[in-house]
Amino acid sequence: MSKTHLTEKKFSDFALHPKVIEALDNKGFSNCTPIQALTLPFTVEGRDVAGQAQTGTGKTLAFLASAFHYLLTHPAAEERQTNQPRALIMAPTRELAVQIYSDAEDLAQATGLKMGLAYGGDGYDKQLKILESGVDILIGTTGRLIDYTKQGHINLNAVQVVVLDEADRMYDLGFIKDIRWLFRRMPPVNERMNLLFSATLSYRVRELAFEQMNHAEYIEVEPLQKTGHRIREELFYPSNEEKMRLLQTLLEEEWPDRCIIFANTKHRCEDIWAHLAADGHRVGLLTGDVAQKKRLRILEEFSNGNIDILVATDVAARGLHIPLVTHVFNYDLPDDCEDYVHRIGRTGRAGESGHSISLACEEYALNLPAIEDYIQHSIPVSKYNSQALLKDLPAPKRRYRSRSGNHQRRNNLSHRNNTPRNNRKRSG
């Protein structure tokens, strides 16, 4: 984590429980990020917080440290039952729930508090077995949480802390009715600590905070600009016919250590994956059609560096903390202006620099004016030489073949044209 991302405030400056401080110190966390420095003064006193902060700002650690501190300093009621979690953390996606759980493991080990996961699509009985043994902190998605609650496997009457992460995304995905259903099964708002975090504190998010929080403190951490001042943005205008070759040429020139390529549909993502896999890239595919176990494995391989390129729909654009992403490619300009910000926010995180490259093709170029109006600046345009694009590229890989990214990067470029690398660079 870059030092420029941190404040002068230290975790030890706050009255956090010693076990929380010890766990943070063991992981090398001493100084707070801005969102952490603003959140902790309120949460150590048990006060509610509604925070606005983009992903990559340290908000996960802010609410985890707050939740663990609260549970350690507020003992559970003597009549609490085994199936009653003390803290509930709700996330919009399975991947984000798993990420939060992973981030919390060191705190759980240091404090002795037990955790459980509840998300759909996989592991119903495995998750249930852990819950039946009793957990202090339950992290999950709303659908599976409601399922377990209706079946009587969990009871929310003893919840002392509730966290709603990515609240705006919850609205986008239509989960707000589920959230309200779960809130109605918990103790009254003044008998629990309530934390809400969102990339935007829109009217509808504030309305939810008013309903379900006890005089929440509103805190905001805004980047210097919506797209982040450490992200270098770049825009190309390819024809539909040259779009794929331009992408592959840019990948050849940039040779990113770790990049995400976003497209607007799963079919387009599959097509991109097929071309890159055939060209020898270590590439993974992340769409809604990919089985849950495989999705988690692909994310793990990407985070560990076994995959260099992740091709994804917007299912992966929000909430996931994937470190050291150097490049983001918008193969398609998104239809939603906010998605542009969330996509390129995968890079340039935690004080690091990043590079965003967007392709404004004939199909999606009409989305550009609204995006530039939303981010309040024009995206710098670069030109390219059509004659310098890579030629003789292999045919896309058949879709039934593995998409897991096990193919090694190419060791030779004998199938390329013979143009020297420096002469193939874009102009402009």
Curated annotation (Swiss-Prot):
UniProt cross-references to InterPro entries, sorted A to Z: DEAD/DEAH_box_helicase_dom (IPR011545), DEAD_box_RNA_helicase (IPR050079), Helicase_ATP-bd (IPR014001), Helicase_C-like (IPR001650), P-loop_NTPase (IPR027417), RNA-helicase_DEAD-box_CS (IPR000629), RNA_helicase_ATP-dep_RhlB (IPR023554), RNA_helicase_DEAD_Q_motif (IPR014014)
The keyword Membrane appears for this protein: no
Residue ranges of the motif Q motif: 9-37
Protein name: ATP-dependent RNA helicase RhlB
SMART domains reported for this sequence: DEXDc, HELICc
GO biological process: RNA catabolic process
Leader sequence residues: none
Highest taxon, organism lineage: Bacteria
Main subcellular localisation: cytoplasm
NCBIfam families reported for this sequence: PRK04837.1
Residue stretches making up the Helicase ATP-binding domain: 40-219
Purpose: DEAD-box RNA helicase involved in RNA degradation. Has RNA-dependent ATPase activity and unwinds double-stranded RNA.
EC number: 3.6.4.13
Subunit structure of this chain's protein: Component of the RNA degradosome, which is a multiprotein complex involved in RNA processing and mRNA degradation.
Residue span of region Disordered: 392-428
Sequence similarity: Belongs to the DEAD box helicase family. RhlB subfamily.
The Helicase C-terminal domain, residue ranges: 245-390
